[in-house]
A protein has these predicted regions:
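Generic hydrophobic, aliphatic-rich segments that mediate packing or membrane embedding
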Residues: 28, 53-59, 82-89
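A substrate-engagement module of RecA-like helicase motors
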Residues: 2-15, 19-23, 67-135
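N-terminal pre-P-loop "Q-motif" helix
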Residues: 19-36
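Walker A/P-loop
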Residues: 38-59
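Histidine (H) residue identity feature
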Residues: 18, 30, 41-42, 83
Length: 135
């Protein structure tokens, strides 16, 4: 990336959880922003550890903050470990932001992970049946 391109991306760094971007993150942020601004989607396939979560969040936050009117970002994950990465990333990001610019985060986990009943850890079909009867 040239110096010109790097300075063009400097604004996106403000929404990263770390002071410096990992290789490939700035390009991903740029591609995500472009897709979001055009009302489209961006599908990223990259190796583990490149910082896809942080880059996607940085782009989404930038797009939300520069949009007309308030915007909400929904970040869905299929695993609790991925969920934790999103929460931790936002916490690290907020540690770098002034109070008036912090990102508000509401996180939710699956119903069986919030249930205090002993049957919550049973098989999903059994849990659904017992939970519906317990209501």
């Amino acid at each position: 990336m040239s110096g010109e391109e790097s300075s063009a991306f400097s604004e996106e760094i403000r929404y990263l959880a770390h002071e410096e971007a990992r290789p490939g993150q700035l390009e991903m942020i740029h591609d995500c922003l472009k897709a979001l601004q055009q009302g489209g989607h961006h599908l990223a396939a990259a190796p583990t550890g490149i910082g896809k979560t942080a880059a996607a969040l940085a782009a989404a936050i930038d797009a939300a903050r520069t949009a007309n009117g308030p915007r909400t970002i929904f970040f869905l994950t299929s695993r609790q470990s991925q969920h934790k990465i999103v929460v931790d990333t936002v916490r690290r990001l907020n540690a770098r932001r002034p109070p008036q610019e912090k990102v508000r985060l509401v996180d939710m986990v699956g119903q069986s992970n919030m249930c205090v009943q002993p049957f919550a850890k049973e098989s999903p079909p059994l849990f659904s049946l017992l939970c519906s009867q317990a209501r």
